[in-house]
Regions:
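Non-heme di-metal
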Residues: 1-205
């Protein structure tokens, strides 16, 4: 994982920086967090597969995103295994105010669906990377520290892949402008969410 640092903490180029206290709040219910995390991995795999299925004419998508889908499913299996070993179970998928906010907030100004999907995937991976970094540094649960530390490299790789695909397939000025708009939207959405034991929850009250 490579990123800039500010005061010793990585900067993930997000409009809103999650406070360090978020990790302790999210870990108050580790089973709920793990169940939600597993669903995040599953949805990420589905997103990668859908991008391939709907855009097979783009060879860069066709040949890069299947590997992302496989990696996300491997992460899903690992998280579910830890969840079950702790006596928990995968709960039914709940609605995601985070994803809903991103898609509803971007729909009215959207000019190209593929561009938005790539950029939103990039931003979601960036936010997940930031949250996993915080969880990997939170004392008290060595197993989860190891889990989230192990996932940082792949999350950073996926984050970079999605923005690079956007830059390859669309004019750079268009990508830069739209990414800036969506980055600000993402920051507003997640800052306004309620606190909970979910990967993409709001800050502590």
């Amino acid at each position: 994982m490579s990123s800039e640092t500010l005061g010793g903490r990585p900067v993930f180029r997000l409009a809103y920086q999650t406070p360090s206290s978020w990790a302790a709040m999210a870990l108050q219910d580790p089973l709920a967090l793990l169940s939600d995390h597993a669903h995040c991995e599953l949805k990420a795999a589905i997103t990668a597969q859908a991008l391939v299925a709907k855009n097979p004419e783009h060879s860069s998508i066709l040949h890069s995103l299947p590997r992302v889908a496989i990696e996300e499913l491997e992460h899903f299996e690992r998280v579910v295994q830890i969840l079950e070993e702790r006596g928990g179970k995968l709960e039914p998928q709940a609605s995601s105010p985070y994803a809903d906010g991103l898609h509803k907030g971007s729909a009215g100004t959207r000019n190209n669906l593929l561009l938005d999907r790539l950029l939103l995937a990039h931003l979601i991976e960036a936010r997940s990377l930031e949250r996993f970094h915080l969880l990997s540094k939170e004392d008290g649960d060595t197993e989860l520290q190891e889990l989230y530390s192990d996932l940082l490299v792949s999350e950073a790789s996926h984050r970079a892949l999605f923005i690079n695909l956007a830059r390859e397939l669309f004019p750079l000025d268009k990508v830069t402008t739209r990414e800036g708009f969506l980055r600000e939207l993402e920051g507003r959405v997640i800052e306004g969410l309620a606190p909970s034991s979910r990967v993409h929850s709001g800050p502590p009250a």
